[in-house]
Each structure stands twice: as structure tokens, then as C-alpha cells.
């Protein structure tokens, strides 16, 4: 504990063996104030940096401190991975390039949103990579969970799952009506639960130990909200404003814009399943 060169390093929060986290200040959904940037791999071996979402001087300083430590360890950075294209996860790549250079990996949808002149590598469901270390190696497999955002990926390893924006212990996860998919989001949560990981490393907030219960709560909450939206339409409500007010009557302090956006996401899924239809701008039961 009193060592001048502690084994864990001066700028290191180790969530699991071969999984470190640094907090990048970002403009994200309150109450979260930061995005979790994960550094995968053993000290002194191959490393992968996930979601280094820097866009200002504070974020730059945080990432530079970590990369300086990585270099001191004589580690090699294999790649930068972005889990999805939302702005609180993407980086100013010119700033990142001032700190280190490495190929950028991400889904095709994510890579399209990144302004970067260096090497990019599209990754897909089922792809995997190894990070060799002096004492142990770590293997990570890519799975796709696109409900929160098209092209969102998670990384599955023995240590747990780098789970991006699927669930959090701080606040909630939105499924934007603009490009989200509520049905795919719920299916993604069910898939993560079925993998039965012992830990999730989320995009925001603390790590999630024994996450099966939290994932089940998320699934039940979203399915329950979808039923409330459906019941609102059955009751004769036909506009987004009316449907959202009815479906979120149990949370009167909710932001109206957010409740309407989430109600619309649920309605889009109900349109997909054929349970409701839209006629002259009004939602009706099929």
C-alpha cells in the first residue's frame, strides 16, 4: 500500500483481472456525468482501449495519464474500440491521435460516424480477439445488441461483459425513437441475461455484479411499460401526448419530452408487431 510504485499503478481502477476503468467527463444523460473508458488486457501485455470518449481538455488529460502509464508498463495498444456511435461514447479522434495511434474497431454503423483518417476495422457478431499478457491472456468475443443504438456491440469475456448502454445502476437507459429499436433492445437484454455473466462493465456508472436480477428488472420494466402504452391506446388515447401521459401516469415527475420519446419507441414496436396501427396521425388498436 505504501509502495512508491504500487502494483496497480497510480492511475488505475481495476474492475476485474485485465479490466481497468477510467472516467471520461462527457455530456451524457443525467444523473451520469462521465462515460466509462475501459482498458482491457494485462499490464505489460497487449491492451485494447474501449470508448475513450474525449472531447475536451479534462478528458484529454485523463486519457493521457492512462496511456502514459500503459507505455511505462511497456504495454502495446492493439486497438481502440467504440461500442456505438452516440456522442457520449465517440471521441475527437484528432485529440486521441495526439496521445496514441492505433487502429479503430467498431461496427460498420459506428465507423461511419467517426471522422478518422487512420486504419479502421469493422467488427461483427461472433468476431473475437486475444490480448496476450506476460502472465495470462484474455479473449473477448463481439456480440451485437443494437436496440439502444444501431450497431451497438458488447464484448464478452471470462471476466464479464463490457455491456455499453444496455443497463446501468445510475439513472436509466433510453431507447431513442429516432434510431433505437425497442424490440431489439428487450431482446438484447434477454440475451445478456441468458449468457449469465457474473459482472457487467457498463458504459456509465459502477460495475454491476451478479447482474441477472438487474437485467430481469429492466426487461420486466420495459415490457410493463409497453403494456401501459398498449392499454393507453385501447383506452382511446390516440396522440403521442395523450398516450405518454397515460402510460407514464405512475411517474408524474418524468420529463414530458423524454416520456413522449419513449412512448413513441414503444409504439414503433407495437406497429411492428401489428398490435396498433397509425391512421391520419392517430394511433389505434388493430
What are these regions (language model features)?
Residues 1, 6, 231-286:
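C-terminal regulatory/interaction regions
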Residues 1-4, 18, 113-115, 121, ...:
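Glycine/proline-rich low-complexity segments that form flexible loops, beta-turns, and polyproline
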Residues 10-68, 154-166:
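Conserved beta-strand hairpin/beta-sheet module of binuclear metal-dependent hydrolase folds
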Residues 17-24, 109-110, 136-140:
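Short Pro/Gly-enriched beta-strand edge/turn motifs at strand-loop
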Residues 33, 54-138:
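Active-site HxH/HxHxD metal-binding segment of metal-dependent hydrolases
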Residues 47-49, 54-57, 128, 134-228:
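Metallo-beta-lactamase
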Residues 63, 90, 185, 189, ...:
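Aromatic/hydrophobic pocket-lining residues that form the small-molecule binding cavity
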Amino acid at each position: 500500500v505504501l509502495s512508491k510504485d504500487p502494483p496497480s499503478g497510480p492511475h488505475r481502477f481495476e474492475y476485474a483481472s485485465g479490466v481497468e476503468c477510467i472516467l471520461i467527463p462527457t455530456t451524457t444523460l443525467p444523473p451520469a456525468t462521465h462515460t466509462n473508458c475501459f482498458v482491457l488486457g494485462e499490464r505489460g501485455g497487449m491492451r485494447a482501449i474501449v470508448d475513450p470518449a474525449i472531447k475536451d481538455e479534462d478528458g484529454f488529460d485523463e486519457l493521457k495519464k492512462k496511456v502514459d502509464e500503459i507505455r511505462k508498463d511497456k504495454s502495446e495498444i492493439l486497438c481502440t474500440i467504440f461500442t456505438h456511435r452516440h456522442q457520449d461514447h465517440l471521441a475527437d479522434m484528432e485529440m486521441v491521435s495526439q496521445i496514441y495511434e492505433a487502429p479503430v474497431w467498431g461496427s460498420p454503423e459506428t465507423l461511419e460516424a467517426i471522422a478518422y483518417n487512420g486504419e479502421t476495422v469493422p467488427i461483427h457478431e461472433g468476431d473475437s480477439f486475444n490480448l496476450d499478457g506476460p502472465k495470462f491472456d484474455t479473449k473477448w468475443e463481439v456480440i451485437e445488441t443494437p436496440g439502444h443504438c444501431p450497431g451497438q456491440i458488447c464484448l464478452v469475456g471470462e471476466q464479464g461483459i463490457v455491456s455499453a448502454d444496455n443497463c446501468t445502476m445510475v439513472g436509466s437507459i433510453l431507447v431513442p425513437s429516432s434510431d433505437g429499436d425497442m424490440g431489439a433492445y428487450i431482446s438484447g437484454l434477454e440475451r445478456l441475461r441468458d449468457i449469465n455473466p457474473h459482472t457487467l462493465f457498463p458504459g456509465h456508472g459502477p460495475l454491476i455484479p451478479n447482474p441477472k436480477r438487474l437485467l430481469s428488472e429492466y426487461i420486466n420494466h420495459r415490457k410493463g411499460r409497453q403494456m401501459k402504452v398498449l392499454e393507453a391506446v385501447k383506452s382511446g388515447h390516440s396522440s403521442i401526448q395523450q398516450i405518454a401521459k397515460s402510460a407514464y401516469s405512475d411517474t408524474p415527475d418524468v420529463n414530458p419530452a423524454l416520456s413522449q420519446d419513449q412512448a413513441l419507441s414503444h409504439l414503433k414496436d407495437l406497429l411492428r408487431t401489428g398490435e396498433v396501427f397509425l391512421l391520419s396521425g392517430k394511433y389505434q388498436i388493430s
